Amino acid sequence: MTAPRDPDALIRRAGRPNPDFDQHFLIDDRVLDRIPTYADGFDRGHVLEIGAGTGALTDRLLSVADRVTAVERDESYASFLREEFADAIAAGDLDVVAGDALAVDLPAFTCAVSNLPYGVASEVTFRLLPAGKPMVLMYQLEFAERMAADPGTSEYGRLSVATQHYADVSIVETVPAAAFDPQPRVESAVVRVTPRDPDYVVADEAFFLSFVKALFTQRRKTTRNAIRNTAHISGLDDPDAVVAAVDDDVLGTRPGSLSPATFAALANVAWGVETAPGPDPQ
């Protein structure tokens, strides 16, 4: 088996990161070697990597995946990847896509493994989650903690509910700033995302997510007041009618204490009120 490429040597050959692209390249060999193992049990027939950079993780993924698609926004690094991994590309094992991961067409991947660009981590995550595929993704630690947070904790919020609507989320490793070049100002974390159907039903998914977003803008208010105060965000025409249809026990709590299932039940009530046919004209 060929030894993995040296991440520091890859940076020397590819060129220093561009600060305008918020690039922080993982250079700790031990972490790089561990990341693919967190995808054990996932279908690695076609692995998607977002933010491939100089290819240190790409190199490790090629050793465990049947095929890898690497997306890289920086054209200079995309060109370097095509040159550095020319043999893998020629063999059909690697595709390099130059472009913004929020805009390019993504392949029908079987799992995603990435050290995400932190500036677009949220947007990329919510582009990938609806695909229902397992993922191993690197985030800022604070972001990862919010993804995995439980109701009633200070970290719990819109991100927690929306992520856990699609998948089980677990932090599998915390990564220090020293593992990157250049070093970020914060710690990072590797998150394992295992898709599953929620144990509740939502009447309309887009409305559910919008409703959750709205209520968390008033997280310190009671749920009663949050529903009334955020109709301009959630799109409710008659928030008082929604409040009247919900149990007082729920209305008296704060949004931060509501489970995803309770949010779903609330959203379903609101959706039912909003879409109920009006009275027949006389």
Swiss-Prot record:
Keyword ATP-binding part of the UniProt annotation: no
GO cellular component: cytoplasm
Top enzyme category: transferase
Compartments where found: Cytoplasm
First-listed, main subcellular location of the protein, grouped into a coarse class: cytoplasm
Binding sites annotated in the UniProt record for S-adenosyl-L-methionine: 24, 26, 51, 72, 100, 115
Keyword terms: Cytoplasm, Methyltransferase, RNA-binding, rRNA processing, S-adenosyl-L-methionine, Transferase
Single GO BP term: rRNA methylation
HAMAP family named in the record: 16SrRNA_methyltr_A
Biological role: Specifically dimethylates two adjacent adenosines in the loop of a conserved hairpin near the 3'-end of 16S rRNA in the 30S particle. May play a critical role in biogenesis of 30S subunits.
Family affiliation: Belongs to the class I-like SAM-binding methyltransferase superfamily. rRNA adenine N(6)-methyltransferase family. RsmA subfamily.
Family annotation (PANTHER family): DIMETHYLADENOSINE TRANSFERASE (PTHR11727), DIMETHYLADENOSINE TRANSFERASE-RELATED (PTHR11727:SF7)
Name of protein: Probable ribosomal RNA small subunit methyltransferase A
Organism for this UniProt entry: Halobacterium salinarum (strain ATCC 700922 / JCM 11081 / NRC-1) (Halobacterium halobium)
